[in-house]
Amino acid sequence: MKNFDINNLVRDNVKVLKPYSSARDEFEDFDTANMVFLDANENPYQNGVNRYPDPQQASVKVVLAKNKGLSPKQILLGNGSDEVLDLLFRAFCEPKEDNVISLPPTYGMYGVLANINNVEHKEILLSESFQPRVEAILEAVTPNTKIIFLCSPNNPTGNSFTTESVTTILEKFNGFVVIDEAYIDFSEKASWLAKLDQYPNLIITQTLSKAYGLAGIRLGICYGSPEVIAVLNKIKPPYNVNELTQQRALERLKDQSKIDNEITSIIAQREALLQVLNQVSFVEKIYPTEANFILVKVDDANKRYDELIVKGIVIRNRTTQPLCENCLRFTIGTEEENKKLMNALKEIS
């Protein structure tokens, strides 16, 4: 990373964009508790959700900032992580001109969003050990490469990328390095959040859908420099996170001990499932995991997938993904769910 300047990456139209100003944005610095709001054409009769939500989700950001040791100005919230990722494309990638890089096998939405935004998507395969091939990645970079996506722990492989490889990419690439940490809470490795101030080109995405158990409310999180977050705030929809989502997130975030207990239970169930998988006759390889799932190579993925479906067990068949021929991905369930899976595996062995 040499002479990094965010202004060299922001799309020209976004630089001059005047963002939409919602009714509530104009009063964000006032004590609104006793104010009468007749500005947004809302239904005035109280039912808990008759008013528009806070467009900046200030209460949620304050809690997240305290938990992570950051400033609220380093946080953007979205309607799931996919919205956050889409905003990165729209803020920094010029259609038909720019490109991004991802490292298959990995989360498929990077490529989908690139196609939606008409941005070239370059794929540099991971190594056989599912680590970034740093030299190949950097060789693929052009002056129009805006983002490199690193999913760590990676989906579907479950492993984290080495600190050395990520650091090299951060230091040698003058675009944004987006580290997708959807599964970081299941890993013993530290988050890259502590490095935000060191690397202005570092962006981190997280979610409440995995360890926090709130997939149904759709809340994704982007952490970055205040300058990055300011750009994303310019282009985000004004009320992209609804009131019910904000309320439910606050309730959950204030109960960290329960979250920690659930994570501990999931990891314990992961270890129990690993022991059973080691005894299944058709399992050929079990890949190391730091997530709430296990990637397993079997003799015939399509056959074993169909057999489990018949027994009422739904898993993910990843055999069509690069480097994942005949691989199945098992999400870690409750103890009861895992017992059903374990019994089914024994029955089809």
Indicate where each model-derived feature is located:
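N-terminal "arm"/small-domain region of PLP-dependent enzymes with the aminotransferase-like
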Residues: M1-K66
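Phosphate-binding glycine-rich loop
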Residues: S59-N99, N117
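Conserved PLP-anchoring active-site segment centered on the Schiff-base-forming lysine
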Residues: A91-L113, S127
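Short beta->alpha connector loops at strand-helix junctions that form conserved
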Residues: P104, E120-E128, R318-T319
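Active-site pre-lysine segment of PLP-dependent enzymes
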Residues: N115, V134-P143, P156-V177, E181-L214
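PLP-dependent enzyme catalytic core of the Aspartate aminotransferase-like
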Residues: E164, V310-K311, Q321-S349
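PLP-dependent aminotransferase class I/II
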Residues: N201-Q279, I286
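Conserved PLP-binding catalytic core of the aspartate aminotransferase-like
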Residues: I266-I267, Q279-K311
